[in-house]
Structures are given as C-alpha cells and as structure tokens.
Regions:
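Sec-dependent N-terminal signal peptides
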Residues: 4-16
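Divalent cation-coordinating acidic motifs and surrounding scaffolds
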Residues: 18-135
Length: 135
C-alpha cells in the first residue's frame, strides 16, 4: 500500500509541475540582414522555451532563410527543434510580413497545419497566424 501511495504521490506532483514555456517575439524585419552573431544571440535567448513565435519575419526569401538559420542554431544546442513559416500576409507591399513558430519536438507536437486566418483580411492589415500544439 505504501508503494502505491508513493507512486501516486510522485505521478501527481510530477504532472502538477509540468510546464510549457511560450515566448512571443517581434524581431522587426527578421531576414537576411541579421548577422550570425545576432542569430546566435536570439537562439541563446529563446532556447529555454518550448514554443517560440516570431512576428515581422521578412516576406521574401531572406525571412524564410533567417528562420531556418535560427532553427539550425537551436538544433546545434542539443535539443531538436522544428519550425513552420506562414505565407506572406495579405497586406499591402509595404506592410506584408510572415510569422513563424519554432518548437522543441520533445516538448510539444504540432497538430495539423498552421494557417493565416483569412476571415479578417479586410479589417486588419496583418491577419493572425494560428497553430495547435499538443502538450
């Protein structure tokens, strides 16, 4: 009986203290202009989080390449990361951007495909980017 109680106690408090850490960061024009030193700084800053969302990823190829470089840098730090990048928002050329999700694959699992919510594209310049994760 004592062993069962101890096991229950351990499982209860282990699950009670499980946390998922989320970070959201507007990196302002995150693209090819970011140096390797800046990418390393960003990776060192976000690496203790489980899910990272980035706003203002440059809409062109430089933005997708910068997110890929960040994911590579995070993967070199010993934990496996994956990422998804949105299509460009439907804003005017000067306001269009992308978003990105990065996550630790051992902490959370992406469910389905992330999407830009088109419902609001006439009311707002940059529609939100949604994703569902399983913890």
């Amino acid at each position: 009986m004592n062993k069962i109680f101890c096991l229950f106690f351990l499982l209860f408090f282990t699950s009670f203290y499980c946390q998922t850490k989320l970070l959201s960061w507007n990196l302002e024009n995150f693209g090819k202009s970011k140096s390797n030193q800046e990418i390393t700084f960003i990776a060192n800053t976000v690496r203790d989080f489980d899910i990272v969302t980035i706003q203002e990823v440059v809409a062109g190829n430089g933005g997708t390449q910068a997110v890929a470089k960040l994911a590579d840098e995070l993967n070199r730090k010993g934990t496996k990361w994956d990422y998804r990048i949105s299509e460009p928002t439907s804003s005017s050329a000067y306001k269009t951007e992308r978003y990105a999700f990065l996550w630790k694959t051992n902490a959370v699992k992406l469910k389905g495909k992330p999407w830009l919510e088109q419902q609001y594209h006439l009311e707002i310049d940059r529609e939100p980017y949604f994703a569902t994760f399983e913890i």
